[in-house]
Regions:
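N-terminal hydrophobic/helix-forming segments and targeting peptides
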Residues: 1-209
Length: 209
């Protein structure tokens, strides 16, 4: 009978593995978007001795440098001893950030509730995204070029938003569907408010927000 990797490790290796797993989980938890991943990766490579390529005037064998592309890609290099025409060793990875993105004008009111209109990105299982707390994470670029980082939901004291689901007593039709259809993409709108503004007739909840 085959053994798992865990069964083959000694106690010291198990401790090392658990520490690696914790650091990996912590990294993913704060790297929900490509931009966040790149920013956090910069901190890691700089800690490992890499320097920003734009700040280096001369390269020699053994130098460690990195470069980013529009804040959404990162390349890290260790300069070798031989000319690049002789080849290079390359490791590549895709920054995958499955998520629901806000549409251009997302805020709308329906049946006394205010929601954010979304479209999903990546190969997500849509039913996994309902009835759980979510964070609003991203970047806003103002007309004057000012960049504002947004992160609402990661801190325990932040407001909580989420995608609502049907109660089991109302979900007979839903439960008969396949996993791909049990929650449709158009149903992934985020609930953000239900308190109406006083003395407002049209879209009072939206007006309050």
């Amino acid at each position: 009978m085959s053994k798992t990797v865990w069964e083959k490790l000694n106690d010291s290796q198990k401790d090392e593995l658990m520490q690696f797993n914790k650091e990996y989980i912590d990294f993913l938890s704060v790297s929900k978007t490509e931009r966040a991943f790149v920013n956090n990766s910069i901190a890691l490579v700089e800690k490992a001795g890499f320097k920003n390529l734009s700040e280096v005037t001369e390269l020699k064998p053994g130098d460690k440098v990195y470069s980013t592309n529009k804040g959404k890609n990162i390349l890290a290099f260790i300069i070798g001893k031989e000319p690049i025409r002789n080849g290079l060793n390359l490791l590549g990875a895709h920054i995958d950030s499955p998520r629901t993105d806000l549409k251009q004008h997302p805020l709308y009111e329906s049946n006394g509730l205010v929601l954010l209109d979304t479209h999903y990105y990546g190969g997500i299982k849509k039913y996994q995204w309902v009835a759980r707390p979510m964070a609003l994470v991203g970047v806003v670029v103002k007309k004057d070029g000012t960049v504002i980082d947004i992160n609402i939901g990661d801190d325990d004291n932040d407001p909580v938003v989420g995608i609502s689901d049907l109660l089991i007593h109302l979900a007979a039709d839903q439960m008969s569907k396949t996993g791909a259809k049990v929650v449709e993409g158009e149903a992934l709108d985020v609930l953000v408010g239900s308190i109406p503004k006083k003395d407002t007739e049209k879209d009072p909840v939206k007006a309050y927000i």
